[in-house]
């Protein structure tokens, strides 16, 4: 007797990580990442010689050292935490729906791939799949890239599954509540700094002027979080991190802001990265280590990084709610 097929399956998607903190593995990862036209939309005739001839011959060794500074005995922080998220969400969903609901990971770049995630869900009998990109704010460089990868996979499938695709959740009540809880928990332990800095991953300014809603959604998230925390306008500020290349990106830049704040008389900051659902190189190294050094070197006295939501209970609850909202029509029709 075969087991009944699950009501649906869930594919949790994040950006990805190198398999190892080595130049070879990082080069392989960067090649795939930076070859995505959603990430770098320059003409391949212009971009690929730069990527293949310069970037992939200079950056992997440097970036590998950065990964080594945050790598754990269990592996990449992003991968370890993502696995915990998937396991806890599967447990939560299975209890909610009173049956086994499979949850698999799929990374836009690196392993496990989005294709392998679909294959695992199919092997478990899932004919309906919710694709849940772990990007609260929509951007063409992240969420649309996931959509492209899903669509590309489906072009090679004879019998495609029924799909639900969660585009964004930047203003979801449960998301704002989870962020607010993480900040309040931090304040309870460490006290409240003079200013809360909300650092979002940046994108080229051109993407925004061409219609990407990402910066507006980031500012909406920030405003809602500040309201939930009861902060005045002078107690919080938005910035954008991780810029790459010579093109102008969204401003203010995180490193420049944190270097300037002590000169404005701000001596203590708490920094949170709301656009990241999972701690990774950009939060654990760039913000928790590098940005801290920038702030303290400029004359700051106290710098605290507030971790991402990761596998916190309220975050898993949020993910469950997002899945329930996407599957409402499926369940009600049965």
Swiss-Prot record:
Catalyzed reaction equations: heme b + 2 H(+) = protoporphyrin IX + Fe(2+)
- InterPro entries noted in UniProt: Ferrochelatase (IPR001015), Ferrochelatase_AS (IPR019772), Ferrochelatase_C (IPR033644), Ferrochelatase_N (IPR033659)
Sorted UniProt keywords: Cytoplasm, Heme biosynthesis, Iron, Lyase, Metal-binding, Porphyrin biosynthesis
Q: Under which EC number(s) is this enzyme classified?
A: 4.98.1.1
Molecular function per GO: ferrochelatase activity; metal ion binding
UniProt xrefs under Pfam families: Ferrochelatase (PF00762)
Positions annotated to bind Fe cation: 201, 282
This chain's function reads:
Catalyzes the ferrous insertion into protoporphyrin IX.
- The identity of this protein, by name, is Ferrochelatase 1
Q: Which organism is it from?
A: Shewanella oneidensis (strain ATCC 700550 / JCM 31522 / CIP 106686 / LMG 19005 / NCIMB 14063 / MR-1)
């Amino acid at each position: 007797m075969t087991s009944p097929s699950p009501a649906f399956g869930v594919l949790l998607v994040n950006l990805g990580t190198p398999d190892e903190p080595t130049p070879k593995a990082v080069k392989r990862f960067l090649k795939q990442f930076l070859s995505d036209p959603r990430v770098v939309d320059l003409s391949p005739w212009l971009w690929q010689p730069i990527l293949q001839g310069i970037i992939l011959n200079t950056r992997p060794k440097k970036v590998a050292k950065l990964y080594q500074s945050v790598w754990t005995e269990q592996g990449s922080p992003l991968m370890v935490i993502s696995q915990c998220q998937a396991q806890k969400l599967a447990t939560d969903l299975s209890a909610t729906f009173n049956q086994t609901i499979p949850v698999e990971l799929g990374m836009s770049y690196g392993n496990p791939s989005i294709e392998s995630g679909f294959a695992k869900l199919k092997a478990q009998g899932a004919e309906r799949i919710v694709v849940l990109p772990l990007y609260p704010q929509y951007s063409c460089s992240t969420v649309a890239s996931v959509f492209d990868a899903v669509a590309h996979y489906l072009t090679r499938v004879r019998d495609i599954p029924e799909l639900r695709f969660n585009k964004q959740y930047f203003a979801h009540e449960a998301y704002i509540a989870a962020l607010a809880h993480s900040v309040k928990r931090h304040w309870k332990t460490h006290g409240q700094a003079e200013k809360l800095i909300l650092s979002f991953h940046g994108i080229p300014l051109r993407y925004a002027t061409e219609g990407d809603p990402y910066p507006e959604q980031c500012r909406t998230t920030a405003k809602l979080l500040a309201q939930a925390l009861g902060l005045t306008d002078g107690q919080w500020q938005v910035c954008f991190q991780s810029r790459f290349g010579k093109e102008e990106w969204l401003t203010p830049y995180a490193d420049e802001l944190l270097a300037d704040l002590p000169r404005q008389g701000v001596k203590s900051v708490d920094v949170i990265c709301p656009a990241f659902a999972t701690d990774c190189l950009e939060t654990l190294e760039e913000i928790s280590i590098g940005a801290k050094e920038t702030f303290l070197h400029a004359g700051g006295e106290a710098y605290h990084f507030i971790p991402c939501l990761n596998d916190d209970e309220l975050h898993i609850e949020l993910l469950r709610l997002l899945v329930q909202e996407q599957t409402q029509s499926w369940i009600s029709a049965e």
